[in-house]
Amino acid sequence: MPCVQAQYGSSPQGASPASQGYSYHSSGEYSSDFLTPEFVKFSMDLTNTEITATTSLPSFSTFMDNYSTGYDVKPPCLYQMPLSGQQSSIKVEDIQMHNYQQHSHLPPQSEEMMPHSGSVYYKPSSPPTPTTPGFQVQHSPMWDDPGSLHNFHQNYVATTHMIEQRKTPVSRLSLFSFKQSPPGTPVSSCQMRFDGPLHVPMNPEPAGSHHVVDGQTFAVPNPIRKPASMGFPGLQIGHASQLLDTQVPSPPSRGSPSNEGLCAVCGDNAACQHYGVRTCEGCKGFFKRTVQKNAKYVCLANKNCPVDKRRRNRCQYCRFQKCLAVGMVKEVVRTDSLKGRRGRLPSKPKSPQEPSPPSPPVSLISALVRAHVDSNPAMTSLDYSRFQANPDYQMSGDDTQHIQQFYDLLTGSMEIIRGWAEKIPGFADLPKADQDLLFESAFLELFVLRLAYRSNPVEGKLIFCNGVVLHRLQCVRGFGEWIDSIVEFSSNLQNMNIDISAFSCIAALAMVTERHWLKEPKRVEELQNKIVNCLKDHVTFNNGGLNRPNYLSKLLGKLPELRTLCTQGLQRIFYLKLEDLVPPPAIIDKLFLDTLPF
């Protein structure tokens, strides 16, 4: 491929780089004794390896073919600039040209320039007769313009300083950069920048622009340049790693919630299930640490703190209770003997020891917890429309309204508790007559037990099954003295800090127990034993029996207290029937008659 090789003559003896000049003749030719012999070799060889480049500059002959130093066409084009140190080579070719623009104020393209797709070929021009330039030292950084003569001055001291700093090899593909100035910039100047790795940007610049070479500025005014005939897009030849950075797409982000579920506790992204429930890694770790350390938390509010992704760390008590409420099973958390041994059995003990109790039936306790959670109102959807913190119960309304409210609360809870009973494993397998008998006999006990576990006796706040919230004083005229016994039982129950798994077992045992007139009492007894064993294993595996002696006995001791409270409730219904201010609903009347002990 034909190319152009620059052949520079030496400067006159004693000429310095700071005193070189150009002279422009009327014929359009340039004359130059450009550099000292030391600088003649500075023709783009930055290290000892040759740098070959096929120029892609437009109409190179327009700028250079009339210099006093001749240009000959030789294949291939070789520019050499010796520099102390090692050598490296760079080959710039096949640079695609874009945005070719022919300016109307320039003469048409001559046949000396023959563009090619990717490279530019030049027709050889006749070498002009060398002329002897007049050397004149210029201390001004700008060019003088005396008519048709243009004296060129550059501060090559900075260039020499730059050469001394370029003694390390220059990496390939990092020497040239071709840029395009911002839109609207006049296209009357050409910029060459040698900054670090050699960059040769061919940009249109404003008039009188300054060129920086390692911190030194060279001012080149407009009169020395010919107007550019082509506009170039920004072409950047950089390191290969830089090119790859713009071509290789970034990997897709991990943890996208598109194909993942949500944590049942806080609503964060959850990839899989932990301890029986789909939860996030944060709630899984919190639940595991709490169970392994047998941590006890205290709620500083009303035990109904919101637990979501943003506020899950505010109240540990409410977060742990929600973990239990959604069905996370403490029995499946690894104990000390299995901690950190994913899927491996503990090492065989050296001395014989008592066999550990079998793990509780996870399916049974999980089903009991799930049934309890599904039958309780959500703390975020409670009905406070009728709640009054300090009501004047003696003046608000008459007895008829309070008695009707009492009956409505009982009947509204009955359907919810019946739905809870049908979800207990094994209960639906009993005869229908036994199911009805067990439910009707234990309804008032379950009503009191569930009400006492949900309510806040310290504030006198009662939360019923249908989500209605009332103050204790609002229930006195309807419930009578029974409400005081319920609040006292609630206070004692919550002082025991019963977790939701143990409470679910106690609630099931309150219904699945021995009753008169059962058709298949043996099957009821078997189901009762399963629930008792489940509760016993739960207490044992959670170290409740070690830290709190007779804890299981205290839990089971709440069942006789419920029988007493149930009797008080029957007495209240009997009193209201005798008062006959409001007739009881048929279902309450049947319940009262079926549960009479005589």
From Swiss-Prot:
CDD domains in UniProt: NR_DBD_NGFI-B, NR_LBD_Nurr1
Residue ranges of every copy of the NR LBD domain listed in the record: 360-595
Domain of life, source organism: Eukaryota
Gene Ontology cellular-component terms listed: cytoplasm; nucleoplasm; nucleus; transcription regulator complex
ZnF endpoints (NR C4-type): 263-283, 299-318
Motif (Bipartite nuclear localization signal (NLS1)): 287-314
Motif nuclear export sequence (NES1) in this chain: 443-452
Annotated region described as Disordered, given as residue ranges: 1-22, 337-361
Any GO BP: central nervous system neuron differentiation
Location within or outside the cell: Cytoplasm; Nucleus
PANTHER family, sorted: NUCLEAR HORMONE RECEPTOR, NUCLEAR RECEPTOR SUBFAMILY 4 GROUP A MEMBER 2
Protein name: Nuclear receptor subfamily 4 group A member 2
Organism: Pongo abelii
Gene label: NR4A2
